[in-house]
Regions:
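Contiguous, glycine/small-aliphatic-enriched amphipathic segments in soluble metabolic enzymes
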Residues: 2-150, 189, 193-277, 281-295, ...
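Ligand-binding beta-strand-loop-alpha-helix segment within the catalytic cores
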Residues: 167-189, 194-196
Length: 343
């Protein structure tokens, strides 16, 4: 009571979402600034950027933006006020080392520090989701990390037993049996056990996000689905047995279907998700269908993580022409997943 009037504290129900800057020499800082100029982002969440504040400040100036930076020491200080970027400043870069469009070992190390901090906050429940801007895999390897991507790094530090990448572009969702392997290695990894594990992970993830009985189409590995063994035996020896066992356990797995038609069928609404056998088999249709709005969702981590579906784009870094659409969509999808709704 204050002067006889009960005062009720207004609780901000918008989730705090950690956004990592990625590689400072790429387009990450630029697309973050561009995305956070939009009120629609602040309408649904409280963005919290993990970055080097000096780099973000430089980009704000270069884009002639009116955004203001507010350094915060902890996630609970994020206010999510439109026009202001709440940032945990790791202060881990020297501007002189950052040359847009060039491999930068210091940038790679800094980027990994942002995502490690974001994972820590997510596991502590201090942020509801993590959204990542791109890192440069070549720079990350040169910096001494053995992880070839965000997902592998997150999986290692969280001890995730089974994990996968799901790309999303409108109605098209694609989970990958494997991603960062050579084509030869990817084909060698097509096995009944691996397929079955990914089917279970996909089924459970989509159920958790509101699709009660997900229809999972499994893509064939070989042309025309192998033509009964004439063009390869993986469908008969590995994929079909995995689909059959999944069905027997209550998973609505279907296929294998020829890869040249299954993605179109998914776009038309026949399936909820497609399980692709390797990186390019899944990435190409998603990016052809909707390159700028496609995003990545991690399956199997102990927290929600979404990402842009593009790289550091060194060829256009620092020029002010990068699109932030993928990042905007990644943030919005993260909010929906927090609410338990993939669609």
């Amino acid at each position: 009571m204050l002067d006889g009037v009960a005062r009720t504290m207004i609780v901000d129900k918008r989730p705090i979402i950690a956004i990592t800057m990625g590689d400072a020499a790429g387009v990450g800082p630029e697309i973050i600034v561009k995305a956070l100029r939009l009120k629609e982002i602040y309408d649904v969440c409280r963005p919290l950027v993990l970055a080097d504040a000096a780099i973000i400040s430089d980009v704000i100036k270069s884009l002639n933006s009116t955004l203001k930076l507010r350094r915060v020491r902890s996630s609970d200080r994020a206010k999510g006020e439109f026009g202001t970027v709440d940032i945990i400043d790791l202060n881990n870069l020297d501007r002189k080392e950052v040359i847009p469009g060039q491999i930068c070992i210091a940038c790679a190390r800094a980027a990994m520090e942002y995502i490690a901090r974001a994972a820590e906050l997510a596991q502590q429940g201090k942020v509801k989701a993590v959204v990542t801007a791109p890192i440069n895999k070549e720079a990350v390897i040169q910096a001494g990390y053995g992880d070839v991507g965000h997902l592998e790094f997150f999986a290692r530090i969280t001890h995730a037993a089974e994990y996968a990448t799901m790309l999303v572009s409108g109605p098209l969702r694609v989970v990958h049996l494997s991603t960062h392997y050579s084509l030869k290695e990817a084909c060698e990894r097509v096995s009944k056990d691996k397929i079955l594990a990914k089917l279970r992970l996909t089924h459970n993830s989509l159920q958790r996000w509101g699709i009660n009985y997900p229809r999972i189409a499994v893509a064939a590995l070989n042309p025309h689905g192998g033509e009964g063994g004439l063009l390869g035996s993986e469908e008969i020896e590995q994929i079909q047995p995995a689909v059959k066992e999944a069905q027997e356990s209550g998973i609505n797995a279907l296929g294998p279907f020829p890869a040249d038609s299954v993605f179109t069928r998914a776009i038309k609404g026949e399936f909820d998700v497609v399980l692709a056998m390797y990186h390019d088999q899944g990435h190409i249709p998603v990016k052809v269908y909707g390159f700028e709005r496609s995003i990545s969702v991690a399956l199997g981590l102990p927290f929600i993580r979404t990402s842009v579906d593009h790289g550091t784009a060194f060829d256009i870094a620092g020029r002010g022409i990068a699109s932030s659409q993928s990042l905007e969509e990644a943030i919005k999808v993260a909010v929906r997943l927090i609410e338990g709704k993939l669609v």
